[in-house]
């Protein structure tokens, strides 16, 4: 016994199942029609009795009433029998289908017990913090250094501010609290403990979906697992740096902060801008 032979046999066994079920349902339909005809006769006889009472009063004797009662009782009995037969046919159809399902489950259990179903594990849904099992031949571009970006922004303040936020990032941004290998590992561990699910739960639904779509389009980034942005994912696609030196996240994916192009001039992330509303008004 192997999986292929079990599948082939199961398909053959199911060949006649549609026609068998259709035949049972046709019988149910036929009994349905008989039931409605029987109920219609009962209603007609009952209407005749009530019509006579409305015309002659309830004390007047109806010569046809006594003859109608046995027929009404007989029709009720017929209707109940038809309903029971319909239930029996429905149970037959259920048993017929359940028999094939049980046979398939039994065969699957046998194959599993013999170790013949040891295929690849099921795919898991995309997770924000999971390690990427595949590496990209062309790694995703990374955000430029914060200082490099600010220097360019200051030097070109009189020209095009958008040039300070290049859509083709260069070197990897340094983490402020990770100056060496040990500190970097500790920082990553601390950020991971926060949990991507908690961060995404606090984000608007449209932002979270946009961030995930952007990650899928960009593909896997570098081998490091340094996390950025509200979504706490590695760098991918286009990213922008917050101009607040004390920003908790530093770098942000465009989709996560609702950007479609490089921002003009000084830019603060949503978290930092809340505390700098007064400064913005002065500027």
UniProtKB/Swiss-Prot annotation:
Record keywords: Cell cycle, Chromatin regulator, DNA damage, DNA repair, Meiosis, Metal-binding, Nucleus, Zinc, Zinc-finger
Binding residues for Zn(2+) 1: 229, 231, 253, 256
InterPro entries in the cross-refs: ING_fam (IPR028651), ING_N_histone-binding (IPR024610), Zinc_finger_PHD-type_CS (IPR019786), Znf_FYVE_PHD (IPR011011), Znf_PHD (IPR001965), Znf_PHD-finger (IPR019787), Znf_RING/FYVE/PHD (IPR013083)
Ligand binding (Zn(2+) 2): 242, 247, 269, 272
Main localization of the protein described in the UniProt heading: nucleus
Cellular compartments per GO CC: NuA4 histone acetyltransferase complex; nucleus
Single GO MF annotation: zinc ion binding
UniProt biased composition (Polar residues): 184-200
Segments of this protein annotated with the region Disordered: 115-201
Low complexity: bias regions: 127-139, 156-170
Record's keyword annotation contains DNA repair: yes
ZnF locations on chain (PHD-type): 226-275
UniProt comment concerning the protein's domains: The PHD-type zinc finger mediates the binding to H3K4me3.
PANTHER family recorded: CHROMATIN MODIFICATION-RELATED PROTEIN YNG2 (PTHR10333:SF100), INHIBITOR OF GROWTH PROTEIN (PTHR10333)
Family per record: Belongs to the ING family.
Subunit relationships: Interacts with H3K4me3 and to a lesser extent with H3K4me2. Component of the NuA4 histone acetyltransferase complex.
Function noted in UniProt: Component of the NuA4 histone acetyltransferase complex which is involved in transcriptional activation of selected genes principally by acetylation of nucleosomal histone H4 and H2A. The NuA4 complex is also involved in DNA repair. Involved in cell cycle progression and meiosis.
Protein name: Chromatin modification-related protein YNG2
Gene that this polypeptide is encoded by: YNG2
């Amino acid at each position: 016994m192997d999986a292929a032979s079990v599948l082939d046999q199961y398909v053959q066994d199911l060949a006649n199942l549609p026609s068998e079920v259709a035949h049972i349902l046709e019988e149910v339909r036929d009994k349905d029609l008989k039931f409605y005809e029987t109920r219609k006769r009962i209603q007609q006889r009952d209407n005749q009795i009530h019509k006579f009472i409305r015309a002659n009063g309830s004390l007047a004797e109806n010569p046809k009433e006594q003859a109608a009662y046995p027929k009404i009782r007989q029709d009720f009995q017929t209707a109940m029998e038809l309903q029971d037969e319909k239930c029996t046919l429905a149970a037959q159809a259920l048993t017929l289908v359940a028999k094939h399902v049980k046979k398939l489950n039994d065969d699957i259990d046998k194959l599993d017990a013999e170790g013949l179903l040891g295929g690849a594990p099921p795919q898991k849904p995309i997770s924000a913090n999971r390690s990427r099992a595949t590496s990209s031949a062309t790694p995703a571009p990374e955000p430029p250094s914060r200082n490099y970006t600010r220097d360019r922004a200051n030097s070109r303040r009189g020209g095009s501010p958008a040039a300070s936020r290049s859509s083709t990032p260069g070197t990897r941004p340094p983490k402020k609290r990770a100056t060496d290998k040990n500190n970097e590992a500790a920082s990553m561990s601390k950020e991971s403990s926060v949990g991507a699910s908690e961060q995404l739960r606090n984000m608007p639904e449209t932002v979270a979906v946009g961030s995930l779509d952007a990650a899928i389009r960009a593909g896997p980034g570098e081998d490091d697992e340094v996390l950025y942005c509200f979504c706490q994912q590695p760098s991918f696609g286009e990213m922008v740096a917050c101009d607040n030196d004390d920003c908790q996240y530093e770098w942000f994916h465009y989709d996560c902060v609702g950007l479609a192009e490089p921002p003009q001039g000084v830019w603060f992330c949503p978290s930092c801008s809340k505390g700098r509303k007064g400064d913005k008004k002065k500027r």
